[in-house]
Amino acid sequence: MHKEYFNTNDGCKIAFRSSLPLKEVTGVAPEKCVLLMHGFSGSSDYFIRNFASLSKSLWVVAPDMRGHGDSSQTRGGYHVARLAADLSGLVAHIRKTASVSIVPVGCSIGAAVLWTYVELFGCNDFAGFVFVDQAPLQDRSAFDGWDEIKAHTGCYDEMTMLAAQYNWINNSKKAHIDLAIGCLGYRCAPKEDDGISAEQQAKDEAFFTNISAKCDQTWLARLLADHTRYDHREAIETITVPVLVMAGRRSSCFPLEGMLESVRRVEKSRPGLARSSVFDSGHWLFYEEPERFNKEIAEFVNSC
């Protein structure tokens, strides 16, 4: 993977990985591009188990979102809508080099960025969408029966959000460890046949906590406040391209019922346009079940 950069319309430098160097893309890029969007406090490094396989048949692009990884940040900008505007800039940057069909894969907050993109810019830039382990609203809500059966399990109202912010700012190391434990299915809901050694568990924990530690924790806490309140349900109903929803059966972040709401919302007016795939893993299913993830992503992207 090649490291590339571009500048947003407000001067923020965004880093991204590309399976092809942009200066050599013209005439050699595959017709299909998969754009991998990481989750909260993550980076493009999250997809270390996916790059090689996906790049065999697809042009793979994976940004570090603003305030994450090797990307810079502004004093403000801690809003999902700003991240969606950054994505719009990345899409334009990619298309300067090649006219290509793009299917974005949004994991966790990456899915929220895509739903916000749909609300702001529509669907025309993309041939399809993949939403990975994220419900369209984290908070519980009095509207449309959105309670603990569908909302986030740990950050779902003002009190729990403030507690999460405090931990990210004041107990960052513990917050990073708790995130790793909660997002790896074999840690939060272990099974006898998982076969993950203690050594591998330690390596996985270090891998993810080191990525989270690169971020400005106060900036992240402010992004969290915006993210958890954002209700994307109606925006999802406007999607007009094929949708694949992936969810982890052992995810500690959301109940399956909440994550599968995206399928129901798309199909309210367009039956058959969306489908789901449930993995036997946690929130980071792309890391825990990479072979299945890579296969299903490649098949879906090539079908769009």
Enumerate the predicted regions with their spans.
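Gly/Ala-rich beta-loop-alpha elbow adjacent to hydrolase catalytic centers
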Residues: 106, 110, 114
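Catalytic histidine-centered segment of alpha/beta-hydrolase-like enzymes
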Residues: 278-294
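Flexible "cap/lid" loop of the alpha/beta hydrolase fold
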Residues: 115, 125-171
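Conserved HGGG/HGGXW glycine-rich cap/lid loop of the alpha/beta-hydrolase fold
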Residues: 12-76, 80
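Conserved alpha/beta-hydrolase catalytic His-Asp/Glu region
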Residues: 140-141, 147, 163-238
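Conserved loop-alpha-helix segment in the C-terminal half of the alpha/beta-hydrolase fold
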Residues: 238-281
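Conserved acidic catalytic loop of the alpha/beta-hydrolase fold
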Residues: 84-101
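Short beta-strand immediately N-terminal to the catalytic nucleophile in serine-hydrolase-like folds
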Residues: 104-106, 132
